[in-house]
Swiss-Prot record:
Residues 25-34 have a biased composition (Polar residues). It is found in: Nucleus. Pfam families: Lge1. Keywords: Activator, Chromatin regulator, Coiled coil, Nucleus, Transcription, Transcription regulation. Involved in transcriptional activation. Also required for ubiquitination of histone H2B to form H2BK123ub1. H2BK123ub1 gives a specific tag for epigenetic transcriptional activation, telomeric silencing, and is also a prerequisite for H3K4me and H3K79me formation. Its precise role in H2BK123ub1 formation however is unclear. This is Transcriptional regulatory protein LGE1. Residues 1-20, 47-60, 115-126 have a biased composition (Low complexity). InterPro entries: Tscrpt_reg_Lge1. It comes from Kluyveromyces lactis (strain ATCC 8585 / CBS 2359 / DSM 70799 / NBRC 1267 / NRRL Y-1140 / WM37). Residues 172-203 form a coiled coil. Residues 1-150 are annotated as: Disordered. It comes from the Eukaryota. Its main location: nucleus.
Length: 230
């Protein structure tokens, strides 16, 4: 025998309580309990509460579609009915300071090439000319300059002539002659000095030899005197 219940369902002994099913859960009390279901508290751990045999859940859940940040149609279960709604992301579009996540930021496109350079390059290649098109940022090539040869002073000339930086050719030639004569005189003096040194060395050797000869004569004279005395 079934008894009327507040939720409009029937409860049989030994069977299941087929009441209102808010989220697919089923309440099975003991078989000895014939009265309406009793609960210790109206609140649940998941945030819902019971009222007049019905279950009201405060937190919305999405069915059929994943949860996204912007513009996704979701369905929530509130008070025993489903209320689909469309979440608008107009506040993100109107706000200029909103930034997308790091991996979704759009890269600005590269600037298009200038029309003047593209037209000139295409016209140059279409005419079949061998000259490459000149770009806007090209610079003229530097002129080739042959390196200047370094002036070397001859060995037989005095370097002081060129240090005076005299542009007069006649005077420069006279200076060259004067310095040349000076060099010749210096060379002769060096030769004379060398000759004098040789003569002094020979004189010293001769004097030493004379001393040796004088000692030899003295020794021989002493020997003769000793023989005569005997």
């Amino acid at each position: 025998m079934s008894e009327p219940n507040e939720g409009g369902s029937s409860y049989r002994s030994g069977g299941n309580y087929n009441g209102y099913k808010p989220s697919g859960n089923r309440y099975q009390p003991n078989s000895n309990n014939r009265g309406p279901p009793r609960y210790r508290s109206n609140h649940r751990q998941d945030g819902g509460y019971y009222n007049n045999g019905g279950y009201h859940q405060q937190q919305g859940y999405g069915y059929g579609q994943p949860t996204h940040a912007h513009g996704v149609q979701r369905q929530t279960y509130r008070g025993g009915s489903y209320h689909p709604y469309q979440h608008s992301d107009s506040r993100y579009g109107s706000n200029s300071t909103y930034r997308r996540p790091y991996g979704q930021q759009s890269v600005p496109p590269a600037p298009p090439p200038s029309t003047a350079s593209s037209v000139s390059s295409s016209s140059a290649y279409s005419r079949g000319s061998n000259v490459l098109p000149v770009s806007r940022n090209s610079y003229p090539s530097p002129k080739y300059e042959q390196p200047k040869k370094k002036f070397t002073i001859p060995k037989d000339e005095n370097p002081f002539i060129y240090m005076m930086s005299n542009d007069d050719h006649s005077r420069t030639s006279k200076l060259k002659e004067v310095y040349k004569e000076n060099d010749q005189i210096d060379n002769k003096l060096e030769e004379l000095k060398l000759k004098i040194f040789k003569d002094e060395l020979e004189l010293g050797l001769m004097s030493t030899q004379c001393e040796k000869d004088a000692l030899n004569v003295q020794l021989t004279q002493e020997k003769l005197d000793s023989l005569l005395m005997n």
